[in-house]
Amino acid sequence: MAETVEVLVPGGRATAGPPIGPALGPLGINVKAVVDDINKKTAEFNGMQVPVKIEVDDKKNVTISVGIPPTTALVMKEVGIEKGSAEPNSIIVGDLPIEAAVRIARMKLDDMLSYELKTAVKEVIGTCVSVGVTVDGKKPKEILAAISAGQYDSVLEA
């Protein structure tokens, strides 16, 4: 019977400790080799939490699938902050260019509830609200209204 383990690991810095080691150890596979493989595959997401799915079949063959980090992590990396605002409505911790929001939306489009880029960008900007990040120097809610009004259609089509 195949086993599947889903974990969130720091990109490029997974260890054989929890949560990976205890989950894979009883399966009788080489945990260090799996961790090394995960680190190679997640190196580009260094410093971000990355979802990883590890599948072990009956013959102890391991398949590793790396997901895309959460939208919050991508926004924070793009802005260059370690942590979101404790009071996002009053304390602003950074500014995200609209082009970066579009780039993140394109990256995450398959994992989002949105079917169109425009609504995916709105989801990313909605994340900015909860992190305490402005978009193009404006409050995210203002940008959302502007997107709905079609003011950013040229950026969304580029």
UniProtKB/Swiss-Prot annotation:
Keyword Ribonucleoprotein part of the UniProt annotation: yes
GO molecular function: large ribosomal subunit rRNA binding; structural constituent of ribosome
Domain of life assignment: Archaea
Alphabetical list of CDD domains matching this protein: Ribosomal_L11 (cd00349)
Any one GO BP annotation for this protein: translation
Encoding gene (name): rpl11
Gene3D superfamilies to which the protein is assigned, alphabetical: Ribosomal protein L11, C-terminal domain, Ribosomal protein L11/L12, N-terminal domain
GO CC aspect terms: large ribosomal subunit
Listed name of the protein: Large ribosomal subunit protein uL11
SMART domains: RL11
Family: Belongs to the universal ribosomal protein uL11 family.
Keywords: Ribonucleoprotein, Ribosomal protein, RNA-binding, rRNA-binding
InterPro entries, per the entry: Ribosomal_uL11, Ribosomal_uL11_C, Ribosomal_uL11_C_sf, Ribosomal_uL11_CS, Ribosomal_uL11_N, Ribosomal_uL11_N_sf
Function: Forms part of the ribosomal stalk which helps the ribosome interact with GTP-bound translation factors.
Oligomer status and interactors: Part of the ribosomal stalk of the 50S ribosomal subunit. Interacts with L10 and the large rRNA to form the base of the stalk. L10 forms an elongated spine to which L12 dimers bind in a sequential fashion forming a multimeric L10(L12)X complex.
HAMAP family to which the protein is assigned, alphabetical: Ribosomal_uL11
